[in-house]
C-alpha cells in the first residue's frame, strides 16, 4: 500500500481484501455468506471470507454493456432474471441478443467454478457481495435485484474503492455499502491499484479451493 501525490493505491486485490475485511468485521457473528463477483472480486472476497469465516460463492450475474461501449454497464443478467437501466439508444433486440450471449457464458461459469455444488441458501442470512471496485454501479444493481428474490436478511455490498455516484445509487438498493475508499475524484477502478492485472479462471479456482480447504479443516 503506497501513497503517491494524487492517489491512495492498493498494492493488489489481496491487500485491498485485507483492508476491506477489517471494515466488515462487525458482521462476523452473523449467519452469513460471501458472494464474489468474478473474476476480480474473488481475491478480494478470499480475504474477507477468511476473516469472517463465511462460505464463499461466485455471483452468477454478468453485466450487459452498452452497444457503443461494452465496458459501460447498462444492466446485468443472471441465469433466471435481468435488470436494465433504460436507454433511448438501446433496442429490445440488442437486449435479447445480449441476454442469450450472457446466459450462455454464465452456464459455463457455473459448471467451471461451482461444479455440481448446490448454491448456498441465502434466506435470512447476511449476504456480503464483494467486487474489486465499483464505477457505475449498474452491474451490482442488477445483482442486488436478483439476490432480493432469495429473501436474504441483509445485503451488504463491500468493495475496496467506489465512485461517489455508485455508492449513492447502491445505497438505495442494498442495506449497506462498505468501501475502503470513496475518492472525491474517480479515475476508474484500476487507477487505485498498483497491480490490476486480469484474474484468470485458474486463479479463481485456486482461491475458491483454498477457502473450501480452510472450512473443511475448521
Q: What does each of the following model-derived ranges do?
A:
Residues 1-218:
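PRPP-associated nucleotide enzymes
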Amino acid at each position: 500500500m503506497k501513497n503517491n501525490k494524487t492517489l491512495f493505491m492498493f498494492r493488489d486485490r489481496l491487500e485491498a481484501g485485507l483492508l476491506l475485511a477489517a471494515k466488515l468485521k462487525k458482521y462476523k457473528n452473523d449467519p452469513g455468506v460471501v458472494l464474489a463477483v468474478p473474476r476480480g472480486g474473488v481475491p478480494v472476497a478470499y480475504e474477507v471470507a477468511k476473516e469472517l469465516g463465511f462460505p464463499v460463492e461466485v455471483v452468477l450475474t454478468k453485466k450487459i454493456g452498452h452497444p457503443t461501449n461494452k465496458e459501460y454497464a447498462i444492466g446485468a443478467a443472471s441465469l433466471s432474471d435481468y435488470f436494465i437501466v433504460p436507454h433511448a439508444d438501446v433496442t429490445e433486440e440488442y437486449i435479447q441478443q445480449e441476454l442469450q450471449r450472457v446466459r450462455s457464458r454464465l452456464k459455463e461459469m457455473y459448471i467451471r467454478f461451482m461444479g455440481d455444488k448446490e448454491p448456498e441458501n441465502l434466506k435470512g442470512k447476511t449476504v456480503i457481495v464483494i467486487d474489486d471496485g465499483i464505477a457505475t454501479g449498474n452491474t451490482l444493481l442488477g445483482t442486488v435485484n436478483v439476490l432480493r428474490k432469495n429473501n436474504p436478511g441483509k445485503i451488504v455490498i463491500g468493495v475496496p474503492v467506489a465512485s461517489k455516484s455508485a455508492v449513492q445509487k447502491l445505497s438505495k438498493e442494498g442495506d449497506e455499502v462498505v468501501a475502503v475508499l470513496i475518492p472525491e475524484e474517480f479515475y476508474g477502478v484500476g487507477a487505485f491499484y498498483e497491480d490490476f492485472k486480469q484474474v484468470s479462471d485458474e486463479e479463481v479456482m485456486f482461491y475458491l479451493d483454498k477457502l473450501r480447504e480452510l472450512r473443511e479443516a475448521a
